[in-house]
Amino acid sequence: NAYPRTKDWGTKMEEVSLSSFRQNIDWQLNSVFHLVQLLSIHMKEINQGSVVNIASVYGIVGNDFTVYEGTDMTSPVAYSAIKGGLINMNRYLASYFGKNNLRFNCVSPGGIQHKQSSKFIKNYNAKVPMKRMGTPEDIAPTVSFLLSEKANYITGQNIAIDGGWTAI
């Protein structure tokens, strides 16, 4: 979802070098562009295909830094730039390749529980309407649906799977 990363990933914005910021953009956004460029050649030949990109709620809404209070975590500046860029590039791709019957969609998960501190989890759960972090099992069914023929008229969409985070 956000790998690889530079060593200063997760440090304060003021401490991130421009070269590091650029490297993260290259690894995590430009790589998607390059992959889609290569995939689209084959997908156009067979006149079908579906791509689901994984974005984030932080590509949709601004960061709530209060969930990081009392932890050694923060939300990296590059993360929001990458995820917001991915959502909008996805819209472009859907528009550009629609005539070729190619579909491009995104899912934007909220916080996914994975080895975060108990303080962060408590802070996060207090903010999200469903009062819990998500799991990969919460995300997978939507991705599977978007890749399936049942979604053959859905393109250019970004679906927030976030326990209500973006609803408030």
Residue ranges and their predicted role:
Residues 41, 95-96, 152:
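Alpha-helical segment proximal to the catalytic Tyr-Lys
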Residues 144, 155-168:
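Short C-terminal tail/terminal secondary-structure segment
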Residues 8-25, 71-74, 123-125:
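Short alpha-helical oligomerization interface
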Residues 128-139, 150:
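A conserved structural motif in NAD(P)-dependent oxidoreductases
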Residues 31, 35-39, 53, 89-90, ...:
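Hydrophobic positions on the long internal alpha-helix
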Residues 48, 98, 103, 154-156:
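Short, small/polar-rich loop/turn modules that mediate ligand/substrate recognition or access, typified
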Residues 2-6, 16-18, 52-85, 90-99:
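Catalytic loop of short-chain dehydrogenase/reductase
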Residues 14-34, 48, 52, 79, ...:
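Catalytic Tyr-X3-Lys loop
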